[in-house]
Regions:
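Charged, terminal alpha-helix-loop-beta segments
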Residues: 1-500
């Protein structure tokens, strides 16, 4: 076989020197052949050598062995080196050497992984929908319609019937995938008007589908059919039943009252102007300045600090007072420096502070006290939103979700919390655990209030809310953009209602 012609430029020896120099400069080298999985390189799974006049590159791992003849290369960058290689039957192709420690190399590696998973997703669909036409399949971003490249999506068609499909990759968040799946379903229904797009097929990694399954149970089957599939590492796909995932990652700790003399030694700190004293459900007292906690009292002990906490002793009192003064100067609506870290930090906590102080402004039917934060607790930890649990004057619970910036996932994150509150309510656990003493709680499902600056509700919010079950009584409350100064309600919208 005659050799493939090499464009004029570097000799084979020079090409080898460039490759070796690039690899020596890499902190995290990897090899990428388009359409194949990324192959990390170590000194033990890679070789570059001359075989006669040919420069051969080989790389291997436990499942594959790659051998290519290198014929040319492009000018290298710090993050990647593009090679022209000869494959079987003299076919020419591209090969990339990447430094995953550099952002550009990591981005290309992620895109390659997305394309590989897209092809796995294609195989899933062929197996589950063998008689359907795979009309569209994409793993590219669509910013106009808020579609993420992290979750490949597809449109399946059979005559005048269609299905939306979306898959969560093995390392992805299956619960987040549902948000994008519902957006994709709505997009197809709006753009494929001659086809009845019946529902959404959601694919999730086996063992990680519970959060998505629980959310599916709270959607309206009349709005769309939703099918859940799980896949294994061996690409074995099974249809899942959301009703099989009834156990929740939630707990409800007993509600404890603080001791009568709790924190007497620290009353001077708690009484400082602008300090908020919030009693938590476990009896501890949180000391805050506009939502930002700087100290906590438990029994007669106080710990303080931003970030790293330490036990306070009497000689720390002056230091704590200076900390409060600093917070008061930086964390105020009248602050001159809006870029100051203490001003910008934890905006949801600041919004919570305003909501607690003016709960009846948000909804006149809500009792201002008691109001509980972060109960029930999530085993998964931080969720990026503030949860408050209140009760109205008739004894009906109300879940209040607070978000200071636009978040596509807010509706379904709020639904997570609503599901857990309803779970404990149905079992009578709030009353049994000491919450809302003296108030007879109604058995109706709780209300769900989404509170955010009016211009910060994500454009897809109405789309996702349109799929909620009628059992979920949801209301959006948009507050004025100057909410740090004053909490003013700009609109109230029920369900998926759109603002005029």
């Amino acid at each position: 076989m005659p050799p493939v012609d090499r464009p004029p430029g570097r000799t084979t020896v020079e090409i080898r020197a460039v490759i070796e120099a690039f690899l020596q400069s890499c902190r995290q080298p990897a090899l990428l052949e388009p359409g194949e999985e990324l192959l990390p390189l170590t000194g033990d799974n890679f070789s570059l050598e001359m075989r006669g006049s040919r420069l051969m590159l080989e790389a291997w791992d436990r499942t594959r062995n790659l051998a290519r003849r290198v014929t040319a290369l492009q000018e290298p960058s710090a993050a990647r080196l593009e090679l022209t290689v000869e494959r079987f039957a003299r076919r020419e192709g591209q090969l990339f050497l990447l430094d995953l420690a550099r952002p550009a190399g990591a981005d290309l590696g992620r895109r390659s992984a997305r394309l590989v998973f897209r092809e796995r997703f294609r195989l899933f669909l062929r197996r589950q929908f063998p008689e359907w036409d795979l009309a569209e399949l994409s793993a590219e971003a669509n910013l106009e319609f808020s579609l993420s490249p992290a979750f490949p999506r597809a449109f399946l068609r059979h005559g005048q019937h269609g299905w939306a499909a979306l898959a969560c990759p093995p390392e992805g968040d299956a619960a987040a995938a549902l948000s994008f799946g519902l957006i994709w379903l709505s997009y197809l229904r709006a753009s494929k008007r001659r086809v009845a797009v019946e529902g959404l097929a959601l694919y999730a990694p086996a063992g990680r589908e519970r959060a998505a399954a629980l959310r599916l149970l709270a959607l309206d089957p009349a709005a769309a059919r939703c099918e859940l599939f799980t896949y294994s590492e061996q690409d074995f796909v099974v249809r899942g039943d959301p009703r099989d995932h009834g156990n929740l990652d939630t707990r409800l700790d007993p509600c404890r009252r603080p001791a009568p003399n709790q924190g007497e030694a620290w009353q001077r700190i708690a009484a400082l102007p602008g300090v908020e004293r919030i009693v938590k459900h476990d009896g501890r007292a949180s000391l805050r300045v506009r939502g930002l906690e700087f100290a906590e009292i438990s029994g007669g002990d106080l710990i303080f600090g931003l970030g790293r906490r330490r036990a306070a002793h009497p000689h720390h009192a002056a230091e704590i007072e200076r900390l409060v003064e600093e917070l008061q100067r930086a964390r105020t609506p009248a602050a001159q420096d809006h870029a100051h870290p203490l001003y910008r930090q934890y905006p949801e906590a600041w919004l919570e502070s305003q909501a607690r102080a003016q709960l009846e402004t948000l909804d006149a039917s809500l009792l201002p006290d008691p109001v509980y934060g972060q109960v029930p607790a999530f085993a998964a930890g931080e969720r990026g939103v503030i949860d408050l649990l209140a009760v109205d004057r008739t004894g009906r619970l109300a879940v209040v979700e607070l978000k200071a910036s636009a978040d596509l996932h807010l509706p379904l994150q709020a639904l997570d919390y609503w599901i857990r509150v309803k779970w404990h309510l149905d079992r009578g656990e709030f009353t049994a655990s000491g919450y809302f003493p003296g108030i007879e709680l109604r058995p109706e499902p709780p209300r769900l209030l989404l509170v955010s600056p009016a211009l910060q509700f994500h454009p897809t919010t109405e789309t996702i809310l349109g799929y909620f079950s009628p059992v979920v009584d949801v209301e959006r409350i948009g507050v004025a953009e100057d909410w740090r100064k004053e909490l003013r309600v700009m609109f109230r919208l029920t369900g998926a209602e759109r603002p005029r």
